[in-house]
Amino acid sequence: MRAPEAAMVATGGGGPGLFTNSKPGDRKIVPDDVGDREVFKVVYVVLESQYQASLSTACKRINAGQPDVAVECSGYILEELRDEANFQQFKKDVEEANIFIGSLIFVQELADKVVSVVEPNRDRLSAVCVFPSMPAVMKLNKIGSFTMVRRAPR
């Protein structure tokens, strides 16, 4: 199986993502020919580049085959958030997003960065879906009426 773009799998030291030479902008998906479709924006943070491939494929399939909706998607490999320019772009993307997805965020300093950006936007976001990650990041989950935030008893 071949990867369609070398930047998606290139590895090496010292690049913008520490473990990858790709940039978040290289993975951004913007739908062509939106027409009358409703566009929603998704931002995700995953541990490694292979995890982002399925999210990118899903977005492309939605954009190609759904008559009523289209997806704009911005993706980040967790380690890319160490780079200040990437982190600032991540903040901007989350501020404009409808949905945030996070997976395998287990590095404390990076988990803290994700929380610092997503938490202030949580109530505005339509959904926040985080799975196996640090507890503070898991508490951001919000899908419909489901939330992992503990409410004070009445």
What are these language model-derived features?
Residues 2-154:
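An N-terminal assembly and electron-transfer interface module characteristic of large anaerobic redox
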